[in-house]
Amino acid sequence: TDTEFEAAGGGVR
């Protein structure tokens, strides 16, 4: 899912 953590550039792709 999209979270602010992903927005910060730290998400599992």
Swiss-Prot record:
**In which broad location class does this protein mainly occur, judging by the first location in its UniProt entry?**
secreted
- Organism in which the protein naturally occurs: Cavia porcellus (Guinea pig)
**PTM comment for this protein?**
Conversion of fibrinogen to fibrin is triggered by thrombin, which cleaves fibrinopeptides A and B from alpha and beta chains, and thus exposes the N-terminal polymerization sites responsible for the formation of the soft clot. The soft clot is converted into the hard clot by factor XIIIA which catalyzes the epsilon-(gamma-glutamyl)lysine cross-linking between gamma chains (stronger) and between alpha chains (weaker) of different monomers.
Q: What is known of its domains?
A: A long coiled coil structure formed by 3 polypeptide chains connects the central nodule to the C-terminal domains (distal nodules). The long C-terminal ends of the alpha chains fold back, contributing a fourth strand to the coiled coil structure.
> What is any one of the record's Gene Ontology cellular component terms?
extracellular region
The cellular location(s) given in this protein's UniProt record come to:
Secreted
Which domain of life does the protein's organism represent?
Answer: Eukaryota
Has the keyword Amino-acid biosynthesis been applied to this entry?
Answer: no
The protein's assembly and partners: Heterohexamer; disulfide linked. Contains 2 sets of 3 non-identical chains (alpha, beta and gamma). The 2 heterotrimers are in head to head conformation with the N-termini in a small central domain.
Q: What does this protein do?
A: Cleaved by the protease thrombin to yield monomers which, together with fibrinogen beta (FGB) and fibrinogen gamma (FGG), polymerize to form an insoluble fibrin matrix. Fibrin has a major function in hemostasis as one of the primary components of blood clots. In addition, functions during the early stages of wound repair to stabilize the lesion and guide cell migration during re-epithelialization. Was originally thought to be essential for platelet aggregation, based on in vitro studies using anticoagulated blood.
Q: Which UniProt keywords apply?
A: Adaptive immunity, Blood coagulation, Coiled coil, Disulfide bond, Hemostasis, Immunity, Innate immunity, Secreted
GO biological process entries: adaptive immune response; blood coagulation; innate immune response
Q: Which gene encodes it?
A: FGA
* The protein, known as: Fibrinogen alpha chain
